[in-house]
Amino acid sequence: MHYIKTWSLLGEMSEKLRRCRKELTAAIDRAFEGVSYSQECTGQQRLELSAAPLSFSLPVHRLLCRRHPLAACSSAAPFAAVPCAPENENPAFATNHAPVNAKPHALCPERKPLTSKENVLMHSSILAPERESWRTAGEGENWRKENLRKDMERDLKADSNMPLNNSSQEVTKDLLDMIDHTSIRTIEELAGKIEFENELNHMCGHCQDSPFKEEAWALLMDKSPQKATDADPGSLKQAFDDHNIVETVLDLEEDYNVMTSFKYQIE
């Protein structure tokens, strides 16, 4: 009786082992079938790629789509052949073999022209020649004077924390008035005018200290003050008025130099 039970247990175990072997064999066969199928698919893809000599990789294909928007760039065939110009042919004159009704792909959309708002905000320099053509000669001169005045006022606002006294404010106001009432358009012209009047004042100072005052005035004014008084009483007054103007400009220059040096020291 004991042997019968043992034999039955061995039979059940052998049956279980047989089923496990069958399942293991089937699993191994399925695994080998999957590997062989993947190898066949890979080989078939390689044959298809080698059969198409004009096929490109995806980045090159996208580049060609950007350069040729009308080329067929369908998502179903991302590696479709794109007509390529020969090496001895100029790419600018290469013919486009794509159909006329072909639509560009979403990866290579055509560039739309800028709107008017974008043109004004991003390319404001395009409108500059038109604005310049609107101005006449007189308007351009007034525009330059206004810009020079605004630049000086902006500099003064930037340096508003500087302790300016009343004389400095008066000097600044005189400079702005001079710009408005003269033909001076730039700081360089103002500096040149001040330098010329400085030399003239230097010469006039030597003339006043010289014992030959009348001869010096005759050389400068092409006539002596005494004769000028006899001939035209207002000419000598005009000469002294001009001299006073030169003195005023020189005082302005000196005050301006003091202000400039003080500004640099603060900075």
UniProtKB/Swiss-Prot annotation:
Post-translational modification Phosphoserine, affected residues: 210, 224
InterPro entries: DUF4712 (IPR031670)
Keywords: Differentiation, Phosphoprotein, Spermatogenesis
A Gene Ontology BP annotation from the UniProt entry: cell differentiation
Disulfide bond sites: none
Role summary: Essential for normal spermatogenesis and male fertility.
Protein name (record): Uncharacterized protein C3orf62
Organism in which the protein naturally occurs: Homo sapiens (Human)
